[in-house]
């Protein structure tokens, strides 16, 4: 599958089967994530793999949705607070951007392996920080990963046209 096909195939999965994610698939996904670019090669990230039953239950308390509980695996995507490249002109920090780039690499790698994923950003930040304390890091997103359930709801992918989002000058 090429990158366009992966992008077209990937969607936000909100129902997973009971089949666990293989260690081989997980390691592949993590390696693709590791290879993502970042501003000035700072790599200001940490990816916390949540797969034990106890840790999964704790994480589910940080985002209490029924569909979320069906995922066999989660990855908490974190930004290193003091290791962001900062643009001098306007002091814009690029850490969240860098983590987002790596996280989308993660999601596309999961798709390539026949797995589904879903970005979650509307979690209880304070509870997550308390439950999974990583000094010097802050959570940016949680990605649920797993095999897509046969009865997983899907929506038609709606995207703006190229004309709406681009200018060629």
Identify the meaning behind each predicted range.
Residues 25, 30-31, 35-102:
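Glycine/small-residue-rich phosphate/adenosyl-binding loop
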Residues 42-45, 112-115, 140:
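Short secondary-structure junction motifs
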């Amino acid at each position: 599958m090429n990158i366009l096909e992966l992008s077209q195939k990937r969607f936000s999965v909100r129902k997973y089967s009971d089949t666990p994610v293989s260690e081989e698939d997980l390691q592949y996904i993590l390696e693709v994530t590791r290879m993502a670019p970042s501003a000035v090669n700072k790599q200001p990230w940490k990816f916390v793999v949540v797969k034990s039953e106890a840790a999964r239950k704790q994480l589910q308390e940080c985002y209490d949705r029924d569909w979320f509980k069906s995922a066999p695996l989660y990855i908490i995507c974190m930004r290193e607070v003091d290791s962001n490249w900062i643009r001098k002109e306007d002091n814009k920090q690029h850490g969240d951007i860098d983590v987002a780039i790596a996280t989308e690499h993660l999601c596309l790698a999961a798709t390539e392996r026949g797995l589904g994923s879903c970005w979650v950003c509307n979690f209880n930040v304070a509870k997550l920080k308390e439950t999974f304390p990583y000094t010097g890091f802050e959570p940016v997103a949680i990605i649920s990963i797993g095999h897509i359930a046969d009865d997983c709801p899907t929506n038609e992918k709606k995207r703006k046209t190229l004309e709406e989002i681009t200018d060629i000058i």
